[in-house]
């Protein structure tokens, strides 16, 4: 039954007993009342229970083929990279769920290094993996890191981003994925150890070693530098999957030089280095090539899985524009649909956009900038017009910088006509 305050004859919350004057809202039901504070408490309890149910059991881990199928929905091409990532991720979480030890055999963690040109899908692959597995995910930029005691970010700040992504749930963060981009930028300046201190190169590699391998790290909850009088969050990195990626510009020449020494001999087929594309060359990658590039042996040793990504050609870029679940063309179609306008990209226009991205050497990452340039004026004008039914993008919009064609309707005569935006 509804509760009343006997003294003031006021309605009261049936759960906590507070009067309507003591709370912001009082929601009435059949013979019962509940205040906004109790509703909020109920939501928190339900959310906690749902979060507890998110832990993956061995049967819940997607199989490699299932992981690959989901990656296919978001990432075009890169078939070999997807296979390698699917297997590595499946084995990683299988190892966690089985307790890292089976019949006295200790299963070691397999962190991943991804090599591929700018805009080839490294970050997208890593973030999609985290989405598939429903685990916290954090991205860090290796170029902002320095070793402890110097201006820049400590490596522990990477772990803070993961904790924040897990809403400060440490147990959840300890099963997350961290992607460190631009890892090639912290290569030391030469293959040989230097007597001068390299605080943003070799020093960072040294600082990353422990968290890559597995340690209990002390993470400052507010970020920034550590100092003795602050409290720390203790985070065990043993089960965190680290994926590092970079373009590694110039590593193809290191590989070609190594291969070139071995093709000289009786009956050997001599192939000019220039005849091999970078994708073919990267397939010959060995850990020794990463050492030659400037990564230290201990760092390379903690990245046993090497995944190579190819540069995207015109056909792949066109497919990226139209096929994935979150394809750019689909996004802009939906944006214009909200203004009551249909959007059409001609096939030649899609090819011209892909060619422009290749010319700019930006890969898939540069596609959005090109499409945004094309659509900016249209998206500025359309909300103020109610006579446009369709927008058509032709190749001349990209090649000759013309405006997209707008199909308008003369409401008095109900006739359609085309005009430039």
From Swiss-Prot:
One GO term describing the cellular component: HslUV protease complex
Keywords for the protein's UniProt record, in alphabetical order: ATP-binding, Chaperone, Metal-binding, Nucleotide-binding, Zinc
Binding residues for Zn(2+): 13, 16, 35, 38
CDD domains: RecA-like_ClpX
Any one biological process term the GO annotation gives: proteolysis involved in protein catabolic process
Residue ranges the record marks as coiled coil: none
Record carries keyword Cytoplasm: no
Protein name: ATP-dependent Clp protease ATP-binding subunit ClpX
Source organism phylogeny: Bacteria, Bacillati, Bacillota, Clostridia, Eubacteriales
């Amino acid at each position: 039954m509804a509760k009343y305050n006997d003294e003031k004859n006021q309605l009261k919350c049936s759960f906590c007993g507070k009067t309507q004057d003591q709370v912001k809202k009082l929601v009435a039901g059949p013979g019962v009342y509940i205040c906004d504070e109790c509703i909020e408490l109920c939501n928190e309890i339900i959310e906690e229970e749902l979060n507890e149910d998110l832990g993956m059991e061995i049967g819940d881990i997607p199989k490699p083929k299932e992981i690959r199928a989901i990656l296919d929905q978001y990432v075009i091409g890169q078939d070999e990279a997807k296979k390698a990532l699917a297997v590595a991720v499946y084995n990683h979480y299988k190892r966690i769920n089985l307790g890292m030890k089976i019949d006295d055999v200790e299963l070691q963690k397999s962190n991943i290094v991804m090599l591929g040109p700018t805009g080839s899908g490294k970050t997208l692959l890593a973030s999609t993996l985290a989405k598939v597995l429903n685990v916290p995910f954090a991205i860090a930029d290796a170029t902002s890191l320095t070793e402890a005691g110097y201006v820049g970010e400590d490596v522990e700040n990477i772990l803070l981003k993961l904790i924040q992504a897990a809403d400060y749930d440490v147990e959840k963060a300890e099963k997350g994925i961290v992607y460190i981009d631009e890892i090639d930028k912290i290569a030391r300046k030469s293959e040989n150890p230097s007597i001068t201190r390299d605080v943003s190169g070799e020093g960072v590699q040294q600082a990353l070693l422990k968290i890559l391998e597995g340690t209990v790290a002390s993470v400052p909850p507010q970020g920034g530098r550590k100092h003795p009088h602050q409290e720390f969050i203790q985070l065990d990195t043993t089960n965190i999957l680290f994926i590092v990626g970079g373009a590694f510009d110039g590593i193809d020449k290191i590989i070609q030089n190594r291969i070139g020494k071995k093709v000289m001999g009786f009956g050997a087929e001599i192939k000019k280095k220039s005849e091999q594309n970078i994708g073919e060359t990267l397939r010959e990658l060995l850990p020794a090539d990463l050492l030659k590039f400037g990564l230290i042996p201990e760092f390379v040793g903690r990245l046993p899985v090497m995944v190579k990504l190819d540069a995207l050609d015109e056909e792949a870029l066109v497919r990226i524009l139209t096929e994935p679940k979150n394809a750019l063309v689909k996004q802009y179609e939906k944006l214009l649909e909200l203004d009551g306008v249909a959007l059409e990209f001609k096939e030649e226009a899609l090819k011209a956009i892909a060619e422009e991205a290749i010319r700019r050497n930006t890969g898939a990452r540069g596609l959005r900038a090109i499409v945004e340039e094309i659509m900016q004026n249209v998206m500025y004008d359309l909300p103020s017009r109610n006579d446009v039914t369709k927008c058509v993008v032709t190749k001349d919009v990209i090649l000759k910088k013309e405006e997209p064609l707008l199909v308008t309707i003369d409401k008095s005569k109900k006739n359609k006509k085309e005009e430039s935006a």
